[in-house]
Curated annotation (Swiss-Prot):
It comes from Listeria innocua serovar 6a (strain ATCC BAA-680 / CLIP 11262). The gene is clpX. ATP binds at P118, T119, G120, S121, G122, K123, T124, L125. Zn(2+) binds at C13, C16, C35, C38. This is ATP-dependent Clp protease ATP-binding subunit ClpX. Belongs to the ClpX chaperone family. SUPFAM superfamilies: Glucocorticoid receptor-like (DNA-binding domain) (SSF57716), P-loop containing nucleoside triphosphate hydrolases (SSF52540).
């Protein structure tokens, strides 16, 4: 290695020997210096060695049918929403490619997406899976934690910081990522008329989100929190970031009914009401979102609206068993690591699905239900070497008995609960 400074007392790179006057930047470490050129060379060598690829080749974005097919590996049902998302995402990244090559004088505008569907219907999972398919940075934010600048709460710029962190602070990659904002219906204003008083967690948040949804160069504090004078800020262009917002929008079906001038007479079964609500939900238009409490400018920046249906019993059973990362497969694998086979009786899966529907948690609540059933099993099995199989029966799923354990000699015993 070279000395830290030459005869004239100038600092120099410990690797290539260039002085600080010969390079753009010299970074100091404990007893060592490295120049920007050597840093760049090191990065190239590491990328070559590890085979690090770019996040996504925008010239080869998967076709809508391919995107929907991959989504179906992880998300059960919701075909209408998957189609809408596949088309919107394909067009979004095709637009980025078109605007970057500048072959056409027509500049394509951005199509952010609004997902409307009940809790646990798969809104977040769809957004996460899209990001995984495209291998782009992804961040999730909760709209209820946001407030407009100057008030106690989280600034909207902190959403962008999460995306930058997801891209390992590579701003260029973050600028082509996906941000999912959940619970967007919770920032609807209380009435469709503009508010006279400040609504800092409702209409104020919508106003604050407008610029980043449309596309602007935002200044983001690198450590999060509020901006301070003399603080170095990260500049990020949001023009190519795809924003997906989601919410349950409870009660929007009634708004659609009123718009269509339809009245429901009499009392139907729960199933009939569910089907009826889903029919109206699929007919949501921007005018209905305005009535619900989103401001016109905000709705204008969400041109793609996709609706998701409430998951029924059959769909929840499929979610438990069919996807690549299905919960039943995960728990089977966990017990497999202890050399124990796990079996769920078909009727037990139906009971788990019924419980999720009763709790009104949809697919989101399935894991907590299984955790509750499996608690004693997962506590006991690691300490035993005579168990070969665990059976979850219908009664065990209902909480009426403990799961059954099969021993090496083939005998079946109930698990003993410990205090």
């Amino acid at each position: 290695m070279f000395k830290f400074n030459d005869e004239k007392g100038q600092l120099k790179c410990s690797f290539c020997g260039k002085t600080q006057d010969q390079v753009r930047k010299l970074v100091a470490g404990p007893g060592v210096y490295i120049c920007d050129e050597c840093i760049e060379l090191c990065n190239e060598i590491i990328e070559e060695e590890l085979g690090i690829s770019e996040f996504v080749d925008f010239g080869e974005v998967p076709k809508p049918q391919e995107i929907r097919h991959i989504l179906s590996d992880y998300v059960i049902g919701q075909e209408r929403a998957k189609k809408a998302l596949a088309v919107a995402v394909y067009n979004h990244y095709k637009r980025i490619n078109s605007n970057e090559t500048k072959e056409d004088e027509v500049e394509l505008s951005k199509s952010n997406i609004c997902l409307i569907g009940p809790t646990g219907s798969g809104k977040t999972l769809l957004a996460q899976t899209l990001a995984r398919i495209l291998n782009v940075p992804f961040a999730i934010a909760d709209a209820t934690s946001l407030t407009e600048a100057g008030y106690v709460g989280e600034d909207v710029e902190n959403i962008l910081l999460k995306l930058i962190q997801s891209a390992d602070y590579d701003v260029e990659k973050a600028e082509k990522g996906i941000i999912y904002i959940d619970e967007i219906d919770k920032v609807a204003r209380k009435s469709e008329n503009p508010s006279i008083t400040r609504d800092v967690s409702g209409e104020g948040v919508q106003q604050a989100l407008l610029k980043i949804l449309e596309g602007t160069v935002a200044s983001v504090p690198p450590q999060g929190g509020r901006k301070h004078p003399h603080q170095e800020l990260i500049q990020i262009d949001t023009g190519n970031i795809l924003f997906i917002v989601g919410g349950a929008f409870d009660g929007i079906e009634q708004i659609v009914k009123n718009r269509m001038g339809e009245k429901v007479i009499g009392f139907g079964t729960d199933n009939a009401k569910l089907k009826e609500d889903e029919t109206y939900l699929s007919r949501v238009v921007p005018e209905d979102l305005l009535k619900f409490g989103l401001i016109p400018e905000f709705i204008g920046r969400l041109p793609v609206i996709a609706t998701l249906e409430q998951l029924d019993e059959a769909a929840l059973v499929s979610i438990l068993t069919e996807p690549k990362n299905a919960l039943v497969k995960q728990y089977k694998r966990m017990l497999e690591l202890d050399d124990v086979e796990l079996e769920f009786e078909p009727t037990a899966l139906i009971e788990i699905a019924k419980e999720a529907i009763e709790r009104k948690t949809g697919a989101r609540g399935l894991r907590s239900i299984i955790e509750q059933i499996m608690l004693e099993v997962m506590f006991e099995i690691p300490s035993r070497d005579d168990i070969t199989k665990c059976i979850i029966t219908e009664k065990a799923a209902r909480g009426e008995e403990e799961p059954q354990l099969q021993l090496e000699d083939g005998s079946i015993i109930p698990i003993k609960t410990s205090a």
